[in-house]
Amino acid sequence: MKLASLAAGIALALGLFTGALAEEPLVIHVGYAAIGVDNRPYSEGTSAATARAGEYLEKEFANDPNIKIEWTFFKGAGPAVNEGFANDQLDFAYQGDLPSLIGRATGLKTRYLLASGARKPLYLAAAKASGITRIEDLKGRKIALQRGTNGHLAAIKVLAAHGLNERDVQVVNLDSAGTVAALTSKDIDAAFGDTQLINLAAKGAADIIYTTKGDDPRFGRNAGVIGRQAFIEAHPEITQRVVDAFVKAAKWSSDEQNRPALFELWHKSGTPVPILEEYFSNDTLAYRNSPLIDDLLVSQYKEQAVKGKAFGLIRRDVDLNGWFEPKYLNSAIERLGLKNFWQSYGADGKPHAS
């Protein structure tokens, strides 16, 4: 009887302990490889930025009191996101192609879940009175870019197409805010970037002399939502709901009737609406906000891996086998009735037949 009572007591204690564990809140840590103006915890230009500003993840788990969403925006961009993954401080993150490939090459256990911010154009702005009117004029000049980001690789590809390499220019490693300050004060001669440069030009503080928009599509930048493999394997149902939320944000961000509201939402980042209008001019929202892991996207990542190593930005070969994990995306698209909502593209950049 004593043994039975002891066993019952242990079972009860274990049950209470297990119940307490079950009630422990789960915090889903979501990172973003950028930060808003004046360090605002928002960004723009991607469906992931919409998910944050529109609280899509928070709404997805609104009826789950033990699940919390915690966003972190990184001034250090993609390289800082890799540190977060390496230290198990992030479960999901929006991240550009080059840093995510570097993370893969260095052994980070992640999975690519959906595209977000794919096909983003790159801009080149020159300081006023710099005498720079074309890419070839950059030789020997001080040029700002943020090392280790997808803009870094895109900039090198643009330079190479015009007969230059990274050693032909004086690279100054600056984040977005630093670039704006240095270009305005003319401490640098030119800079690669996007909306912050469009904004400077609109104020008359710099001149846009080039953009990849309308040029070779291989010069553009890609990005996506990356997940930590250990979290995905431990919480597949929650991972599915996270992807569902991102897909819903992508759908809303792709609807042309939402264009004005979308830019107003992204304005939470501090980027003026007219700048966003220019950034997305001549592009459909669906083209820029598609979450699809199609042949074009995969081929672009493969090319970025090869080019990244060739340019010395990635030290090892990048094994992409098994990295792309489309099953959660495909499930979301099927259940949300979005099978033909976005156009998929082949590796040659041409649309797939419907």
Model-derived segments and their meaning:
Residues V172, G178-G270:
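Pocket-lining segment of extracytoplasmic ligand-binding domains
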Residues V37-D38, A234-V318:
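Secondary-structure end/capping motifs
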Residues V306-S354:
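Conserved C-terminal helix/tail region of periplasmic/extracytoplasmic solute-binding proteins
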Residues Y94-T106, I156, A161, I188-D207, ...:
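A ligand-binding cleft/hinge motif common to bilobed small-molecule-binding domains
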Residues G36-K68, T106, V158, Q300-E303:
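Short, polar/charged alpha-helical segment
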Residues W71-E83, G96, L164, V169-T184:
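Short helix-initiation/N-cap motifs at beta->coil->alpha
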Residues A127-K142, E233-E237:
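Flexible hinge/capping segments at coil-to-helix
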Residues E24-A48, I67-F73, G140-A144, Q170-V172:
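Short, well-ordered beta-strand elements
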